[in-house]
């Protein structure tokens, strides 16, 4: 939901590792999701560059010992789970105790990381859930310490589920076979008519000249033939107009939807099937990016004075979450696509 609208409405706001909040002017207490330190950057300097105030830098410094290697920089070390999650939860608890923002977002990626690396259901994921339970308890104790436990709505959400993978396929290899991609003798990309970009268990196909009717028709025919054969990881090809009707728009011309066990690679060099790679979320042992009705569904749980007890929704649309939260705060969201989940509210 709109942090800017909450600022206008007069609420104080906080965000810890919530995606795309870097230097967000409407966040009063901000510790941004910090992935990629620049060369020569210090830990505190990096967070400051992403919008953390001096007050937040003190909290970061206090909890720095929880980071891998005490916060020595480097993407792999800094974003190592669950250490980074211990750090960010501790920071969030300190913000709650010291500043009590009226609206706060906290994001950890421990379960997401475990599923990418090991699959959807396994002992590693169960251990990750135990840690999530621990962190929720820490946040609740921080609310209790601040005196706001019983007047706070606590909501647990997820942006997606995941499905297990059996393989990772490279559609661009077959584009090259069809003459849609040209490579030199060393396998370097020389030119292209159509190019497939991975979104994990879906993929966007771009045309170099989207207005070229012949290129469009040739690419569509190649994709439909591949889908009909059923061996290339997808059995459905959506046009841009079809995906736009479902809420997905962009500069692409087509979208490929997974067969349910295949992820897609952007690479154009053989072999056409690539090995799993735990360092890239698209190619781990489980991932996301598919149509939302597939697979285990993302989480939504809520407790607090604004919510009715023992209410169960069989399903809901993720776009309904922000309007529901806005309704709790009395913040208008006139441009929102979703609706308020009234059944949940007192």
Question: For the regions a protein language model found, what residue spans apply to each?
Answer:
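A short beta-strand-to-alpha-helix junction
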Residues: 127, 184-199, 210-222, 295, ...
């Amino acid at each position: 939901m709109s942090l800017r609208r909450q600022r206008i409405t007069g609420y104080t706001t906080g965000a810890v590792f919530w995606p795309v909040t870097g230097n967000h002017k409407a966040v009063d207490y901000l510790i941004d999701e910090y992935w990629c330190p620049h060369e020569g950057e210090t830990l505190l300097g990096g967070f400051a560059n992403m919008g953390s105030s001096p007050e937040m830098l003190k909290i970061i410094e206090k909890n720095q010992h929880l980071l891998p290697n005490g916060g020595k920089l480097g993407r792999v070390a800094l974003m190592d789970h669950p250490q980074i999650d211990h750090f960010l939860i501790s920071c969030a608890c300190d913000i709650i105790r010291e500043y009590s923002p009226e609206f706060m977002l906290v994001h950890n990626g421990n379960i997401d990381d475990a599923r990418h690396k090991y699959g959807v259901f396994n002992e590693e994921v169960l251990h990750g859930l135990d840690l999530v339970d621990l962190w929720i308890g820490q946040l609740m104790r921080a609310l209790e310490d601040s005196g706001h436990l019983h007047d706070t709505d606590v909501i647990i959400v997820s942006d997606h589920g995941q499905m297990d993978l059996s393989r990772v396929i490279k559609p661009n290899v077959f584009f090259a076979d069809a003459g849609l991609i040209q490579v030199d003798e060393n396998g370097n990309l020389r030119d292209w008519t159509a190019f497939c970009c991975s979104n994990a268990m879906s993929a966007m196909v771009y045309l170099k000249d989207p207005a070229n009717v012949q290129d469009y028709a040739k690419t569509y025919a190649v994709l439909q033939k591949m889908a009909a054969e059923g061996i290339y990881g997808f059995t459905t090809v959506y046009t841009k107009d079809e995906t736009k009707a479902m809420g997905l728009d962009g500069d692409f011309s087509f979208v490929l939807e997974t067969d349910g066990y295949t992820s897609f690679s952007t690479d154009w060099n053989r072999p056409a099937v690539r090995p799993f790679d735990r360092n890239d979320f698209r190619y781990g042992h489980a991932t996301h990016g598919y149509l939302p009705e597939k697979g285990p569904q993302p989480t939504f749980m809520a407790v607090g004075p604004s919510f009715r007890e023992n209410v169960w929704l069989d399903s809901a649309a993720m776009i309904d979450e922000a309007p529901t939260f806005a309704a709790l705060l009395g913040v208008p969201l006139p441009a929102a696509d979703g609706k308020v989940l009234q059944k949940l509210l007192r």
